[in-house]
Amino acid sequence: MKQQRNYKMILVTAIMVFFGSTSMMAQVPPSGKYNTTNYPEDRKAIEALGMLADSSAYLNDDYISVGAEGMVYYGRMEENNSFKKNDIKFKSVTPVQGTAILRIFDGKTAISNAILNVVFSSSKGDLHVKVIRSATYVKQLGKWYIVFGQGTLVKTEAELEGSMKKSLQKN
């Protein structure tokens, strides 16, 4: 039993060293690795989608989202209803400089990724989170739409270590 526990601690330590040493490098896209200048007009159209406050940016019937809390939403309305149910509204979204990347493929499909500092307002107070936001876009009949979005919570090293220890205890 003691030997198994020592093995788990060595494993956790090795994983933490690995993630701790690569976490900052992995957050910023490598310079020059991806084509981030092709289709300049499409880039402008896709970036403008983020400024729309209505559902016209979404291909509503085909939109799927995974929230940072781990819930899957099928359609923009389902996602909006979750915000209303939990009394949460976006207060601010601030991209972390140098983390945004937008890749466009064949002028018809695009994928974006960025780290965002997000503040939600709620009746219980403001909720501050840092997320890695990824989105997929498609172009239909000359217009870009968001069809998939996912927010993944960025954990501190202590939070990551705690969740790893908790996961190891389940085994």
Predicted segment positions?
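A solvent-exposed, acidic/Ser-Thr-rich amphipathic alpha-helical stretch
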Residues: 37-40, 44-45, 56-108, 127, ...
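Bacterial N-terminal signal peptides
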Residues: 10-23
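A short, structured loop/turn motif at beta-sheet edges
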Residues: 102-110, 124-125, 137-143
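Bacterial N-terminal signal peptides that target proteins for export
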Residues: 2-12
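Short beta-strand edge/turn micro-motifs at domain boundaries
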Residues: 130-158
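Short, low-complexity N-terminal intrinsically disordered segments enriched in polar/charged residues
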Residues: 21, 25-58, 164-171
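Short, surface-exposed coil-to-beta transition loops
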Residues: 95-98, 113-115, 128-134
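A short hydrophobic beta-strand element
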Residues: 108-118
